[in-house]
Amino acid sequence: MTLNGFYNTIGGDYGDVTKRLVSEEFASRMVVKFLKDGSFAALSSAMAARNIDEAFRAAHTLKGVAQNLGFTNLGKSAAELTEVLRVRTFSGSDELYEKVKSDYDFLIAALKEFAES
């Protein structure tokens, strides 16, 4: 799978990422490094522990990384969750977390396929 094909699969912004990260080669390396990013695991732990500060921090980090890498769907869902958690409430956050998890799982499956090709 090509980098462009990966972005087509996930509904991401290939053009923006390759422009911002200067080259397709560098963008490819950064995208694959996302497999080691711990922000989703931190978010999951914080949500389970009902630790609002850690959940907000992890959601905010995940949002930023996803947006910088052009992971449009994950960036949007993480941004929505971030805004709910910003006001220091879990009200409505569980449904948004499930959307983030779904977007993350889809992205990781596509990313593993890209990394193996």
Placement of each model-derived feature along the sequence:
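Two-component system phosphorelay core
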Residues: 1-57, 61-117
